Amino acid sequence: MMFQQSDRDRNHPQSPLWRLSSAFRYAIATLCFVLPVASASAQTPATGAKAPDFTLATPSGTSVSLATETAKGTTVLVVLRGFPGYQCPYCVKQVHDFVEHSSDFAARNFNVLFVYPGPAAQLDQHAKEFLEKQAELPANIKLVIDPEYKMTNLYGLRWDAPHETAYPSTFVLDKKGNILFEKISRSHGDRTSAEDILSQIKKR
């Protein structure tokens, strides 16, 4: 004869079914609590916060860490759209603008670090092609690649849509890595210019 539990037995705290049901409910409740926390960790750092450190490589393979750059002086961190399937003309224009003002940045002991994000496949080659559209980068300006959006995700800047990579963004960091200024653009052409940065610093 098959043993059948009554409703009362199934709901008894010592019942195996009751214990299994309780464990399942606990697991679901735990997931609901943990998932929002994981999502919150990717929030974009704001003015006054400390910028998360990262290490990326130049297209030629030289490692560059944000902490090393900020230790040298005020650092302008610019996240480009990188390679969304083509070379972004707004990015070309923005980098050209900063290169033209490199002496103004150098006079204030500023470093500029561009981040070029995109899918890992041939990203270094795409970045080299991008730099061919520029004059040679001066000593106080560097460009690093962000394959598979490591830094982009760390800063909560991933523009997760077809033919998109990252929201164009600019941060100004002091020598301790604290954010003095930040701008996150939600369109391709809304960029921070070199003059914008220089005028912001003059106000401080």
Describe each model-derived feature in a short phrase.
Residues 1-22:
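N-terminal secretory signal peptides that target proteins for export/translocation
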Residues 26-37:
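Bacterial N-terminal signal peptides
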Residues 40-68, 93, 97:
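N-terminal "domain-start" segment that seeds a small globular fold
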Residues 69-96:
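Short active-site neighborhood of thiol/selenol oxidoreductases, capturing the structured segment around
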Residues 87-139, 150-152:
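Structural microenvironment flanking redox-active thiols in thiol-disulfide oxidoreductases
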Residues 138-141, 159-171:
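Structural micro-motif
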Residues 165-204:
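Thiol-/selenol-based redox modules, centered on thioredoxin-like
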